[in-house]
């Protein structure tokens, strides 16, 4: 992790950022980043220099919503993981509309920008870049609304990318694993008693039981 950006300068030397990117199989940017000018600089340099699959989440999505020019260097191996509030800022659609038309809105954003979109709702929609494929994930629980749960999803997707999955498959399978892990954790700790780390801790158990799933 590069650390939270607090100043107006890039929060780490550019050479160090390039070294981190070059040594990575996948990258996540956004969780815990903040929205300072230093965060803008980090997002800009990461987006322009990253060649490996990139998961864009949280504050990185909010910064892109404020500065769409950051997408000028977009690539098809990027995965955006917005919740409805972030999707509203990215698209200017109202949240109720996004909830009602999640499939169409995710697909439209995918088609316009050429990135995979994993729109996190009660039944998440994954619109795959460079494809007409759209997956709908039906696993999950209201417990996934916990703070930090979305960060867990980003980490799951990045882990699958590191295993060699294509971005669309990693996003779809990651959403399924995340939902099932939430169900397992909620069964153990109750809907109101779980924390994001409990969801993460349940992922290995879910993966062992889900290895035979195939995406069509």
Segments from the language model and where they lie:
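Short, well-structured alpha-helical segments that form the helix of a local strand-helix-strand
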Residues: 102-110, 167-181, 196-204
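Short, small-residue alpha-helix embedded
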Residues: 88-89, 143-177
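Short, charged, surface-exposed loops that flank catalytic or proteolytic processing sites
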Residues: 95-102, 164-169, 190-194
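Glycine-rich phosphate/dinucleotide-binding loop and adjoining beta-alpha-beta core of small-molecule
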Residues: 1-139, 208, 212-216
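Short beta-alpha connecting loops at secondary-structure transitions
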Residues: 90-91, 137-144, 154-158, 183-192
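Hydrophobic alpha-helical scaffolding
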Residues: 3, 7, 32-33, 147, ...
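Charged C-terminal helix
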Residues: 182-216
């Amino acid at each position: 992790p590069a650390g939270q950006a607090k100043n107006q300068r890039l929060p780490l030397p550019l050479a160090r950022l390039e070294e981190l990117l070059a040594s990575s199989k996948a990258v996540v940017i956004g969780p815990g980043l903040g929205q300072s000018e230093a965060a803008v600089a980090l997002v800009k340099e990461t987006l322009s220099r990253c060649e490996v699959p990139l998961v864009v989440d949280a504050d990185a999505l909010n910064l892109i919503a404020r500065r769409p020019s950051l997408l000028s260097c977009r690539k098809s191996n990027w995965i955006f993981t917005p919740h409805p509030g972030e999707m509203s800022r990215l698209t200017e659609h109202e949240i109720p509309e996004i909830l009602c038309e999640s499939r169409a809105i995710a697909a439209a954003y995918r088609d316009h920008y050429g990135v995979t979109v994993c729109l996190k709702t009660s039944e998440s929609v994954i619109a795959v870049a460079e494809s007409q494929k759209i997956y709908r994930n039906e696993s999950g629980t209201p417990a996934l609304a916990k703070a930090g749960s979305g960060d867990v999803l980003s980490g799951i997707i990045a882990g699958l990318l590191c295993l060699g999955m294509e971005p669309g498959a990693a996003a779809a399978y990651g959403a399924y694993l995340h939902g099932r892990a939430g169900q397992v954790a909620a069964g153990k700790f109750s809907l109101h008693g779980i924390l994001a780390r409990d969801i993460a801790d349940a992922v290995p158990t879910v993966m062992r039981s889900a290895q035979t799933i195939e995406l069509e």
